[in-house]
């Protein structure tokens, strides 16, 4: 077992920030090969993206870290700690904590795509964290690349000199060695603060079935030794450091980690929620006085009900969610029941991508078939008595008579697109109650549009719509800015006078009629005909605002009456009518699963 007491001057902690698909994980693979951490014949594409789902979607979901040893041109051996960060807006808190563990960042921009919205958002996070930023243009070998145009965008954005921009092709391995040399020259070494009390920043944690939660941390001050008693600031819990070490492709145990090192800590933590991202670890016997700044509890922004297709799979769903939440501390869930769907869970997610990933992992890794209800945001309802209720499920909304006002969360959105699509995007924004703020021109063809939106309007399918109105050229990023008053109403769906709780939604009053009408039409096309007439109504409180009727299937009871008396026929028709009436009183309309999914894709009409 080696001791990791390296000289701080030879350590470089850096991360790669980029928009989705700009080649971040591929560049990380080239680093691993260039530093002989990974032999070419071992390589699987995107080594750091170890979830199947991460490779398939081409995104990084969890933060990862790896240590490489590199001998530079001057003959000195350096330790490079690469902290790979998620690039998606849903995981921006994880990104900010990963950045806090570094001294430098590579800002990777695709030579064919240029600067995108998340590139800018992550750049701002890196600037806030005070990092040395190295601009890198990737994919320079592609025929469609525009290196000079993209360089100009970076110069306008960051104010750097053209000579500071590095050019690479991660796929072909061009320029990788020059980039490694630039990291050593330009990224500062950590400050040597080994004599201070221990403070270490947690930037990720994963769950291992045998070892418990494995905590990834960056030592900021002091030293951590194997066998030390450590304390977590967020919950004051004390654990024994059973094993500490650094992270190559596999974990490498060491006896000591000092300030500037990035490593892992195993201390028999049963629940990953005890090791929160952004928390500070210190020694229980000689604690630091205050935690590192920047920690916050991550709150879910989007809520949705998950129900098993088969009600007898409820326990399987519970177990699957428990296992998933061991590895994902930002997933929140509570049991709930619905008259239409039975037993299920109300789950809170960081955003839409997070929600999709959880659903896909449930179905793929745990083979649980689920129905998802319409995603909602958390509304604040101020009652006429002055109390405040938080509502994340339309069925929990109090009666209109008790409501003084309703507030909903707003987000600040930046959309980067080509100038020719401004009109389309403005139109889409107005449809979604967006409030235009201002426009920045990035260059002669690309613009950055700033809006403020209610979160509920973009949580649904806004991203898909944005891509279609801009022919795929727009990218977006959003940031939460707080609650505002809104004129919102609860829209109920009634089938033969009975409310179906799973189809209720909260909508803006100006959109209620249109939404109700389209929902009724959609349900009419999906719910099968019954032996009796079915009335589908959309209502706000007791006021019905839209209605569709599914006509009854009827048997021709007069088929066997050849000629004969009219009163005989009338008697048979009356008898049929009575039967239908009775059937309608006792019959319940079976709602097919597609009806719940119909609400999710209302715009496909």
From Swiss-Prot:
Reactions catalysed, semicolon-separated, are: GTP + H2O = GDP + phosphate + H(+)
Sum up the protein's function in the record's words.
Required for accurate and efficient protein synthesis under certain stress conditions. May act as a fidelity factor of the translation reaction, by catalyzing a one-codon backward translocation of tRNAs on improperly translocated ribosomes. Back-translocation proceeds from a post-translocation (POST) complex to a pre-translocation (PRE) complex, thus giving elongation factor G a second chance to translocate the tRNAs correctly. Binds to ribosomes in a GTP-dependent manner.
GO CC terms, sorted: plasma membrane
User: What coarse category fits the chief subcellular location reported for this protein?
Assistant: membrane
> What name does this protein carry?
Elongation factor 4
Xref: Pfam families? EFG_C (PF00679), GTP_EFTU (PF00009), GTP_EFTU_D2 (PF03144), LepA_C (PF06421)
HAMAP family under this entry?
LepA (MF_00071)
Family the entry assigns: Belongs to the TRAFAC class translation factor GTPase superfamily. Classic translation factor GTPase family. LepA subfamily.
Q: Name one GO molecular function term.
A: ribosome binding
Recorded topology in the membrane: Peripheral membrane protein
Its lineage reads:
Bacteria, Pseudomonadati, Chlorobiota, Chlorobiia, Chlorobiales
Q: Does the keyword S-adenosyl-L-methionine apply?
A: no
> Is Hydrolase one of the keywords UniProt gives this record?
yes
Q: Any idea where the tr-type G domain is? A: 9-191
Cellular compartment(s): Cell inner membrane
Enumerate the UniProt keywords alphabetically: Cell inner membrane, Cell membrane, GTP-binding, Hydrolase, Membrane, Nucleotide-binding, Protein biosynthesis
């Amino acid at each position: 077992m080696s001791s990791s007491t390296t000289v701080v001057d030879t350590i470089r902690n850096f991360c790669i920030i980029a928009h989705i698909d700009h080649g971040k994980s591929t560049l990380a693979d080239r680093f691993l090969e260039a530093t002989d951490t990974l032999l070419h014949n071992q390589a699987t594409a995107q080594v750091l993206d170890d979830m199947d789902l991460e490779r398939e979607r081409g995104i990084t979901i969890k933060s990862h870290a790896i240590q490489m040893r590199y001998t530079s041109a001057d003959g000195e051996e350096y330790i490079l700690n690469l902290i790979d960060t998620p690039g998606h807006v849903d995981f921006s808190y994880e990104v900010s904590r990963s950045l806090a563990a570094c001294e430098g960042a590579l800002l990777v921009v695709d030579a064919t795509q240029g600067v995108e919205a998340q590139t800018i958002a992550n750049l701002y996070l890196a600037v806030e964290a005070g990092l040395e930023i190295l601009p890198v243009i990737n994919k320079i070998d592609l025929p469609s690349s525009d290196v000079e145009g993209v360089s100009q965008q970076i110069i306008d954005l960051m104010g750097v000199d053209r000579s500071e921009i590095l050019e690479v092709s991660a796929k072909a391995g061009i320029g990788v060695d020059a980039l490694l040399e630039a990291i050593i020259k330009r990224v500062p070494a950590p400050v040597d603060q080994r004599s201070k009390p221990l403070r270490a920043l947690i930037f990720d944690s994963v769950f291992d079935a045998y070892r418990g939660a494995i905590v990834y941390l960056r030592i900021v001050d002091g030293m951590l030794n194997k066998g030390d008693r450590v304390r977590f600031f967020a919950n004051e819990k004390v654990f024994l450091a059973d094993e500490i070490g650094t992270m190559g492709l596999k974990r490498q145990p060491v006896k000591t980690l000092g300030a500037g090192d990035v490593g892992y800590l195993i201390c028999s933590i049963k629940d990953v929620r005890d090791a929160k991202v952004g928390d500070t670890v210190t020694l229980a016997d000689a604690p630091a006085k205050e935690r590192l700044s920047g920690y916050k509890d991550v709150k879910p922004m989007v809520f949705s009900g998950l129900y098993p297709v088969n009600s007898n799979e409820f326990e399987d769903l519970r177990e699957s969610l428990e296992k998933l939440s061991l590895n994902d501390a930002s997933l929140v869930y509570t049991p709930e029941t619905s008259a239409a769907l039975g037993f299920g869970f109300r789950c809170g997610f960081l955003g839409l991508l997070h929600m999709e990933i959880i659903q896909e992992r449930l179905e793929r890794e745990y083979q649980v078939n689920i129905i998802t209800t319409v995603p909602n945001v958390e509304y604040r309802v101020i009652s006429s008595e002055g109390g405040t209720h938080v509502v994340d499920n339309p069925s929990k909304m109090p009666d209109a008579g008790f409501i003084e006002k309703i507030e909903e969360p707003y987000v600040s959105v930046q959309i980067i697109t080509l100038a020719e699509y401004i009109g389309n995007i403005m139109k889409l924004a107005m449809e979604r109650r967006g409030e235009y703020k201002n426009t920045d021109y990035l260059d002669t063809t690309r613009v950055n549009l700033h809006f403020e939106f209610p979160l509920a309007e973009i949580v649904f399918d806004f991203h898909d719509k944005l891509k279609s109105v801009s022919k795929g050229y727009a990218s977006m990023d959003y940031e939460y800015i707080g609650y505002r008053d809104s004129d919102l109403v609860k829209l109920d769906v009634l089938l033969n006078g009975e409310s179906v709780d799973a189809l209720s939604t909260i909508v803006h009053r100006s959109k209620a009629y249109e939404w109700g009408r389209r929902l009724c039409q959609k349900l009419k096309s999906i719910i099968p005909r019954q032996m009796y007439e079915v009335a589908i109504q959309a209502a706000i409180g007791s006021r019905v605002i839209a209605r569709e009727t599914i006509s009854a299937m009827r048997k021709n009871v007069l088929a066997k009456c050849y000629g004969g008396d009219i009163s005989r026929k009338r008697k048979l028709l009356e008898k049929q009518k009575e039967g239908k009436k009775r059937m309608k009183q006792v019959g319940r309309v079976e709602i097919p699963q597609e009806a719940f999914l119909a609400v999710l894709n209302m715009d496909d009409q």
